[in-house]
A protein has these predicted regions:
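Non-catalytic peripheral regions of nucleotide-handling enzymes
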Residues: 2-26, 138, 211-217, 248-285
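Acidic/His-leaning functional-site neighborhoods
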Residues: 148-149, 159-259
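Secondary-structure boundary elements
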Residues: 9-82
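Residues in well-ordered beta-strands of folded domains
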Residues: 41, 50, 106, 122, ...
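Hydrophobic/aromatic-rich core segments of domains that either
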Residues: 92-161
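Short Gly/charged-rich anion-binding patches and loops
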Residues: 17, 93-94, 244-245
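N-terminal short leaders/motifs
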Residues: 70-81, 110-125, 129-131, 156-183
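Extended, compositionally biased flexible segments
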Residues: 56-116
Length: 285
């Protein structure tokens, strides 16, 4: 991964990733205009949020640098295997594609339950700024303005509210409930800072669970380990898919059973290591 992603798209494989992306989706639009941005972001939302590939890379990479999946690998992974990535790889990839297409964009960090564990992009265009968040499946650019903005999705209404000091809060609205999801800080972060947070994300608790999510015309699919939730206009349906996990993920996400099985095996070994008694110590409590 080259250090020049945000000012030299060739350093980050941006041009090559863009060619693969355009060949797969053929989004409408021409130059760096708002409608083109919407088309690219909408097409890119087909890539699912999933940490299967990240889990596999965590346990198989030869070095910390090798575990970061670059833009070509992310797009090629979707074309070949219907995989996607987590917020860092999805953001890095989309940022490089947009930069290579002539858009001015930079990475930003967001706070969830912990600081700086989520990320997104800010795109600048015609004296306006837009939040683009491929890791939260919003599916379209959202203008960063002085007034709150609401976006309708198939599973909830997403609301972005200005706060203070270059911060915006993102909520989801379902029925009468408003849930805070994160606070995004729109000040640009350096390439080095972005990569550092990306590397640190491999140690987050979420990496101890298989997580997948994507939007469909019917609603929102969410998998955590062997629990599947489908959330749509008619409500929620929960299902335990432990007995046919690999088959169901293949059916719902198109991801090959071998990929799910490999991630599952790595986590199973990790959990067995937690239960194993320390060397030289009795196993009983």
């Amino acid at each position: 991964l080259g250090p020049g992603i945000w000012n030299d798209p060739f350093a980050s494989e941006g041009a090559a990733a863009r060619e693969i992306f355009l060949a797969r989706f053929s989004p409408a639009g021409g130059g760096p205009a708002l409608e083109t941005l919407r088309c690219i972001v909408s097409s890119y939302a087909n890539l699912p949020y999933e940490n299967l590939t990240k889990i596999i890379r965590k346990f198989t990479a030869r070095s910390p640098e090798d575990r970061l999946r670059g833009p070509v690998e992310v797009v090629r992974g979707y074309v070949d295997d219907n995989t996607g990535g987590t917020c860092f790889s999805l953001t890095y990839c989309l940022g490089s594609i947009l930069a290579s297409a002539g858009f001015r964009c930079h990475p930003v960090m967001a706070d969830m339950k912990q600081p700086n564990i989520h990320c997104a992009l800010v795109v600048e265009m015609d004296a306006r700024r837009y939040l683009v968040d491929p890791g939260y499946l919003v599916g379209e650019p959202v203008e960063l303005g002085a007034a709150p903005v609401r976006i309708e999705t198939t599973f909830a209404v997403v609301e972005l509210r200005p706060r203070h000091g270059e911060r915006w809060d993102l909520f989801t609205l379902e029925g009468g409930d408003r849930k805070w999801r994160y606070t995004v800080k729109t000040t640009p972060v350096s390439h080095e800072t972005f990569i550092r947070h990306w590397q640190e994300s491999f140690s987050l608790p979420m990496m101890n669970n298989m997580l997948l999510t994507r939007l469909t015309p019917q609603g929102h699919l969410y998998v955590k380990n062997h629990h599947l939730r489908v959330k749509g206009p008619q409500g929620k349906v929960n299902e335990n898919i432990r007995g046919d996990l690999e088959t169901r993920i293949a059916a719902e996400f198109g991801i090959a059973p071998a990929i799910t099985a490999q991630a599952r095996e790595h986590l199973d070994r990790l959990r067995r290591s937690w239960r194993a008694p320390a060397a030289g110590r009795p196993g009983g409590g």
